[in-house]
Amino acid sequence: MDKKIKRVAMVGAGLVGVSVLYSCMNRGLAEQYGIIDINDKLSVGHSLDFEDASAANNHNFSVGKIEYSDLKDYDVVVITAGRPQKPGETRLEMVADNAKIMSNIAKNIKKSGFKGVSIVVANPVDVMTFIYQHETGFDKNRVISSGTSLDSARLRFEISKKLKVHPKSVQAFVLGEHGDSSVSVYSAATVSGKSFNEIVKERGISKKELEDMHTTVYKKAYEIINRKGSTYFGIGSTVAELVEAILTDSHAIFGVGVYLTGQYGVKDLYIGVPTVLGSKGVVEVINFNLTKEEQEKFVSSATILKGNIQKALEAIKG
């Protein structure tokens, strides 16, 4: 097969998986897309629907159901498969069920001879990424999670709304768990190059207002799930950005889950931090000088994730 053709595979044909694929297709990121799902009927159905969409798309691509053995020719595999989050349920309450699913997926992908970059999206995302890397033994830099990329986008939106500016004028990151223990790093945020903290002082934005913004960020998923059952458009667009950074070797910076070896004072786990992404996955972890409060919250988030990693490891042993 022609290795110059860019190929993206999706494991999991649920709402998140197909939203990621559709975002990738509309961005013209690859020439070939493959879908793997335990439900063959669903994979074929989506493939046929995407064929119709391709006829009205400005980008040329093919899409179809594939097998795990086909992954050896793919550049990126995105893994969204897992049971969905229920209304009122935290992501961490899904650990045992999704760890077993992820373990099986990882073994199949390893067997395929896949050599590209893996992006794990299934929740709880950094715990599942640890299990995936543990089971595949893949280079840790070639395995990432969607991490806090969506959380960071939500924070940028909240800051932009507060200041009445376009979200693209805001650079801000959420670190830690993709969930309730995440940390909005206001100390490193900028708006058109100006320190957000300076703007906070100038405009008299209170600490409570900042706390409320963070609460809105981490609770937004629950708001969406309670109203429509699941989130998929936001994460679909966000993950497509990660795929684009990998396929184009852009070296863009995202808040993704990467394996830390001492950065930010933690190690031996996947957790959301600002990261430079390229064709081989992780290029560099960007170190922010966190405030004492931010650092303490980040370490606390890491501790929570480590506890859940142990639960996941126990689940796949059983």
From Swiss-Prot:
Substrate binds at residues 85, 91, 123-126, 151-154, 231. One of its GO terms (biological process) is lactate metabolic process. InterPro entries: L-lactate/malate_DH (IPR001557), L-lactate_DH (IPR011304), L-lactate_DH_AS (IPR018177), Lactate/malate_DH_C (IPR022383), Lactate/malate_DH_N (IPR001236), Lactate_DH/Glyco_Ohase_4_C (IPR015955), NAD(P)-bd_dom_sf (IPR036291). It catalyses: (S)-lactate + NAD(+) = pyruvate + NADH + H(+). It is an enzyme of class 1 (oxidoreductase). Disulfide bonds: none annotated. Keywords: Cytoplasm, NAD, Oxidoreductase, Phosphoprotein. NAD(+) binds at residues 16, 37, 68, 121-123, 146. Catalyzes the conversion of lactate to pyruvate. Belongs to the LDH/MDH superfamily. LDH family. NCBIfam families: L-LDH-NAD, PRK00066.1. This is L-lactate dehydrogenase. It comes from Mycoplasma mobile (strain ATCC 43663 / 163K / NCTC 11711). The lineage of its organism: Bacteria, Bacillati, Mycoplasmatota, Mycoplasmoidales, Metamycoplasmataceae. The gene is ldh.
